[in-house]
Amino acid sequence: MKTRSKLAAGFLTLMSVATLAACSGKTSNGTNVVTMKGDTITVSDFYDQVKTSKAAQQSMLTLILSRVFDTQYGDKVSDKKVSEAYNKTAKGYGNSFSSALSQAGLTPEGYKQQIRTTMLVEYAVKEAAKKELTEANYKEAYKNYTPETSVQVIKLDAEDKAKSVLKDVKADGADFAKIAKEKTTATDKKVEYKFDSAGTTLPKEVMSAAFKLDKNGVSDVVSTVDSTTYKTSYYIIKVTDKTEKKSDWKSYKNRLKEVILKDKTSDRAFQNKVISKALEKANVKIKDKAFAGILSQYATTSGSSSLKK
């Protein structure tokens, strides 16, 4: 929920700002929000005070995206899907869910709206990615594709220990599989793996090292850093089998399709391009200069005026 909360934190924190600004038919900018001896605070006073804050900027951006994508793709995400996602998160947090929502500045309905907007954007990006399934892109993906490779892996937590184990496995007559099972620090004690270049079971550095080896080849120590914990792990790899790459890309069409779609949907530049097109289609125009820059990340090279003030 933390990632999605970042998307909508401003939306709920200052939802009242957007509401006050939009309700000119019900209240005027001079309507008093607070009265006190010798002074008043009007809607306009409040709006001018908060609109330049980071939270208000994020609030307005989230509100724009919510309105635009709901208008263009609203029928593609059902309430059932939103509820399922919401309930899954709630179940994961257990009794602390209400507290987690509160700390993130969210209400149940607000979080559901956030989930809905995220799903709508994801749908739009996936549909755009499908249009990238051209023969040229298939052939390009094929060039970078390595078919299934089988390996034995020893994972270690200390560099000096890894260097010591490396000497053991490279000694004449060494039984790599036996040493791997004895020495690996992997929590599941797993040492046998199969993967292609699109796999995610092992760090990319480990897979890349494996692809460079011949059958029965043993790597040097390969170090990786966990992007979440920043912990360094050390790997020693032995390739036990390699699948020869077929000459026709169509032999891997289904797998290459997965690769292309994954690459596109996870590409921030591609995501921004899709969002930019949706904003242009909606003819979004920023009327208050305080919010002039909130859509700059989605500006296209054509410099569409719809993304400007």
Swiss-Prot record:
Belongs to the PrsA family. It comes from the Bacteria. Its main location: membrane. A lipid is attached at residue 23 (S-diacylglycerol cysteine). GO terms for cellular component: plasma membrane. It catalyses: [protein]-peptidylproline (omega=180) = [protein]-peptidylproline (omega=0). One of its GO terms (biological process) is protein folding. Pfam families: Rotamase_2. GO terms for molecular function: peptidyl-prolyl cis-trans isomerase activity. This is Foldase protein PrsA. Residues 1-22 form the signal peptide. Keywords: Cell membrane, Isomerase, Lipoprotein, Membrane, Palmitate, Rotamase, Signal. Residues 146-241 form the PpiC domain. It is found in: Cell membrane. Plays a major role in protein secretion by helping the post-translocational extracellular folding of several secreted proteins. A lipid is attached at residue 23 (N-palmitoyl cysteine). Its EC number is 5.2.1.8. It is a lipid-anchor. PANTHER family: FOLDASE PROTEIN PRSA, PEPTIDYLPROLYL ISOMERASE.
